[in-house]
Structures are given as C-alpha cells and as structure tokens.
Regions:
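Charged, compositionally biased N-terminal leader segments and the immediate start
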Residues: 1-17
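Short terminal or interdomain "cap/linker" segment that borders an active site or interface and mediates
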Residues: 1-5, 120-152
Length: 152
C-alpha cells in the first residue's frame, strides 16, 4: 500500500534529498511555528484535550515528529509513530476537518520559511513540492487510522 502511495506521489531519490535540505531549512523555525500553531489551537478551543498542561508535551512531540518526518526513510518506526498519532487524534475525537486544517496552518508557515529563504526560485519550488508530498503521506497515514479497527 505505501509503495503505491509513494509511486503515486512520485517520491524518489531527488525528493528524499530535497527533504533533508527542507529539514535543515525548517528545523531552526520549528519552535516558533509550533508555538504559534498551539496558540491558535488554544484560541479556537478546538479540543478540550489541549490544555495548558498538555501543550508543552504536545509541542515537544510535534517538533520531534516534524524532524523525524523530513529525515524519514519511511521505515517501521515512522509508520508505528504515525499510527499512534492518528489513533490518539481519533481517540480524543479530533475531527478530520480540524486535523487537516491544523496541518494546513503548519504547512503555510513552513512555506513562508521557504519563500523567505535565499534559495533560487527553482530550489524553492522543489522544496515546496517535497513539503507537499511529505505532508500528504503523513496526513494520509494518520487519517487512515481513523477507520482502522484495532485488534488486541
């Protein structure tokens, strides 16, 4: 299944190399971007589970996940992590619409960093394409757990 998704999104060696460049560019901005994201989530009172207590833990987990995503070789550790994330979002009854909207907010902030970088327009285009592909994979896998049946 995942191979077909990669093929459909045309994730190749160039995309993976671009993801590492993207990681180097975005990582210094994760703190600020994630801080602003959770401030927005709290302001909109999207979930009762996003309390002041939970925020610090969520920020740290989000930074680790973002970094892991762009460095991912898409091995079992990544798949297990994204399944846990999706299941947790489902278990706290986070609507898929808020999951997608939230990821869009993050994506737009990441794109702002790309746009403001010193890279050439061609490289910026490649970085945005890579960002889109990696976020599509991440969202698709997380959201697929919403319908998954868990058997103990």
């Amino acid at each position: 299944m995942i191979g077909k998704l990669f093929e459909f999104l045309e994730v190749d060696a160039e995309t993976r190399a671009s993801a590492l460049v993207l990681s180097d560019l975005l990582t210094p901005h994760f703190e600020d971007i994630i801080e602003r994201f959770y401030s927005k989530v709290q302001a909109f009172d999207i979930s009762p589970h996003v309390t002041d207590q939970a925020i610090e833990m969520l920020k740290q987990k989000h930074k680790r996940h973002s970094s892991a995503l762009f460095h991912s070789q898409f091995q079992e550790e990544y798949f297990a992590s994204i399944r846990r994330i999706g299941i947790r979002h489902r278990d706290v009854a986070l609507s898929p619409k808020w999951y997608v909207a939230g990821y869009m907010k993050l994506k737009l902030a990441f794109i702002e960093v790309i746009i403001r970088s010193d890279y050439s327009i061609v490289t910026k285009g490649q970085l945005v394409k890579t960002l889109e592909k990696y976020i599509a994979i991440d969202m698709a896998l997380a959201l697929s757990t919403y319908d998954a049946v868990i058997v103990d």
